[in-house]
Amino acid sequence: MELGELLYNKSEYIETASGNKVSRQSVLCGSQNIVLNGKTIVMNDCIIRGDLANVRVGRHCVVKSRSVIRPPFKKFSKGVAFFPLHIGDHVFIEEDCVVNAAQIGSYVHVGKNCVIGRRCVLKDCCKILDNTVLPPETVVPPFTVFSGCPGLFSGELPECTQELMIDVTKSYYQKFLPLTQV
């Protein structure tokens, strides 16, 4: 299936020198602690909580509308500690997700309306289907599909998943064009 052009109003997005496109309607708390490594798209009404701990996002990632990305925390007897959140390259996070993971590897697809529980680890080349809720501290192995509530193993992915995710994220970025370039 070929992706059509996705047009956006240039005044509604900020484009950085490294090619990141961030919606002006998104909220980046503690932006000095948020690193977007390049050609990443953050769409409208997203929230990235860099004020809690460092958030690092790799290259060619897409965070779609109304998703929340926040670092994981752990409760201790003396209070709460937040830990950095690392997201790899070529990660696609669909609409309405809440991501509270410790780590998301590269070439990962998170479906619509998912909740990734605190301190989850999503290894490279995995997929989380729509409406999945992963319990805290779940580890999703490489080349697996998780679905349901609670999120459980439901299938495997082919060895070409890495190439597929590279194609998807790069083509999405190339087709995400300002209205003036049409």
Swiss-Prot record:
This is Dynactin subunit 5. Its main location: cytoplasm. It is found in: Cytoplasm, Cytoskeleton; Chromosome, Centromere, Kinetochore. Part of the dynactin complex that activates the molecular motor dynein for ultra-processive transport along microtubules. GO terms for biological process: aorta development; coronary vasculature development; ventricular septum development. Coiled coil: none annotated. Belongs to the dynactin subunits 5/6 family. Dynactin subunit 5 subfamily. The modification N-acetylmethionine is found at M1. PANTHER family: DYNACTIN SUBUNIT 5. Keywords: Acetylation, Centromere, Chromosome, Cytoplasm, Cytoskeleton, Kinetochore. Subunit of dynactin, a multiprotein complex part of a tripartite complex with dynein and a adapter, such as BICDL1, BICD2 or HOOK3. The dynactin complex is built around ACTR1A/ACTB filament and consists of an actin-related filament composed of a shoulder domain, a pointed end and a barbed end. Its length is defined by its flexible shoulder domain. The soulder is composed of 2 DCTN1 subunits, 4 DCTN2 and 2 DCTN3. The 4 DCNT2 (via N-terminus) bind the ACTR1A filament and act as molecular rulers to determine the length. The pointed end is important for binding dynein-dynactin cargo adapters. Pfam families: DCTN5. GO terms for cellular component: centrosome; cytoplasm; dynactin complex; kinetochore; nuclear membrane; nucleoplasm.
